[in-house]
Amino acid sequence: MRMNDHQDSESFTYERTWHEIEDMLDRAERKQNMHYTKMQKAIKSERIYHMRNYKALEGVVKALRWVLGDKNIDHPLE
């Protein structure tokens, strides 16, 4: 897979519903909250794991909010 395969429209179905996207956002936020809670209570080695996953999900949440038109998200990559 090339880095710019997103330009290949045959790879995308564009069939996701708003409900599916909202559900994914809800799941991502719940998972992010779980990692945040565990990060607060964990020993250092485990805290790093939860911190890394929390930060990764931060990007997922921001991108999904942008897709849904959140007025507070100007651009998902900033």
Task: For the regions a language model picked out, list residue spans one by one.
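Short, charge/polar-rich alpha-helical segments
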Residues: 2-29
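Short, charge-rich amphipathic interface segments used for partner binding and complex assembly
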Residues: 34-78
